[in-house]
Amino acid sequence: MKTLRLTYQLIAIPAAFSLSTCHTQSSQQQPTPPNIIYILADDMGYGDINAFNPHSQIPTPTLDSMASAGIMFTDAHSNSSVSTPTRYGTLTGRYAFRSSLKKGVLTGYSSPLIEKGRETIASFLSNQGYQTACIGKWHLGWDWAYIQNSQRKQKDVDFSQPIKNGPTERGFDYFYGIPASLGTAPHVYIENNKVTALPNRTIGPQKGIKLIRNGV
């Protein structure tokens, strides 16, 4: 039942606060909202974590500690088997198939999949007074800036300019991470809405190295 209390608490805090302003004589302090950590790992098996599988050969002491202090869900299901739609569903609470992406995943140059104005769990929590951050792989698209009067192809991206419609415009106060998968171009790190260092070379596809899919 702890999960229900958490859900109700997040929703009830604004209402409780507004009621307390009407009853100024009430000195009862509002409960402190809990910290929330959401980890989405690619290609992690159900039995990889010791908390779920005592015979696992992978040490996971921190995750085990989090599991013992919280609730373990033993019959949970993802709404997709691949990265992008899973992330879309997680952040928006919608079935992934309701997005414009009907198969596969986005690239590092794709436009935003989360529609402008669409509420996310990040924007919802931000409106409740939370400070929100996203660290790691985004893989939901954003708008790159392009060199003026160019053909607006991948080679024409202006990495010196800020990105638009990325994580910080979808509810997150802070972002540090990569556009898509590690093996997907462009290989740059983004902090908030700007690259941390301008790319200085291009590597084309190389035979036998499947991780470099379409060059840098």
What does each model-identified segment do?
Residues 2, 6-8, 22-216:
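Formylglycine-dependent sulfatase
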Residues 9-18:
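Bacterial N-terminal signal peptides
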